[in-house]
C-alpha cells in the first residue's frame, strides 16, 4: 500500500519541476497567444537589471506533500512502538519542509527588469525571463502588448 503512494508522490514532485516557464521570456509564446492581435509600440531601454523570478508559493505544495510522504515512510522504518510513531511523524514534518524548499528552488528562473521610454514619452517597467537575446541600455526595442501583458523584444 505504501509503495504505490510513494511512487505517485515522487512522480508528482518530479513532473511539477518539468512545468514550462519559458512563456515568461520574450522569445516563447503560449498557444493561446498565437494568432492573437497585439498592439505594437517602440521605445528605448533606459536600464537593464538582472532579477530572479520566483514561482508562486502554491507551486511548492507538491514538493511538501511528496517530501512528507517520503519522510514519513523513511521515519516509519526506524525503531518500533512509540519510537516508530515519533520517527514517522518527525520524518513527515522534516520531509515536508525539505520537499517544499527543493520545489521552491526549482520554481526560480533568471529574469531581467527592463525600464523602457516609449516613443510617446511615457516610461514603463517590464519584468520577463531572460531569453537568449541580451538587452543593453540605449537599445531600441519593440513592445507587443495585449491587455496588461507586455513582451519586450529587440528591434
Curated annotation (Swiss-Prot):
Span of the signal peptide: 1-17
Membrane-crossing segments per the record: none
Lipid attachment locations (N-palmitoyl cysteine): 18
UniProt KW Signal keyword: yes
Family matches, as InterPro entries: Bact_OM_lipoprot/Surf_antigen, Gly_zipper_2TM_dom
Subcellular location: Cell outer membrane
GO cellular component, one term: cell outer membrane
Lipidation (S-diacylglycerol cysteine): 18
Family membership: Belongs to the Pcp/SlyB lipoprotein family.
Role, per record: Facilitates ferrioxamine uptake.
Name this protein carries in UniProt: Outer membrane lipoprotein pcp
Gene: pcp
Amino acid at each position: 500500500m505504501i509503495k504505490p503512494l510513494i511512487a505517485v508522490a515522487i512522480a508528482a514532485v518530479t513532473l511539477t519541476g518539468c512545468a514550462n516557464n519559458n512563456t515568461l521570456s520574450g522569445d516563447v509564446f503560449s498557444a493561446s497567444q498565437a494568432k492573437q492581435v497585439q498592439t505594437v509600440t517602440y521605445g528605448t531601454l533606459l536600464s537593464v537589471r538582472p532579477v530572479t523570478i520566483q514561482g508562486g508559493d502554491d507551486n511548492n505544495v507538491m514538493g511538501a506533500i511528496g517530501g512528507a510522504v517520503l519522510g514519513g515512510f523513511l521515519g516509519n522504518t526506524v525503531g518500533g512502538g512509540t519510537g516508530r510513531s515519533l520517527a514517522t511523524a518527525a520524518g513527515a514534518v522534516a520531509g515536508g519542509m525539505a520537499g517544499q524548499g527543493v520545489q521552491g528552488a526549482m520554481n526560480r528562473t533568471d529574469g531581467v527588469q527592463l525600464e523602457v521610454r516609449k516613443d510617446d514619452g511615457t516610461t514603463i517597467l517590464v519584468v520577463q525571463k531572460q531569453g537568449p537575446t541580451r538587452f543593453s541600455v540605449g537599445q531600441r526595442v519593440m513592445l507587443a502588448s495585449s491587455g496588461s501583458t507586455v513582451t519586450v523584444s529587440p528591434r
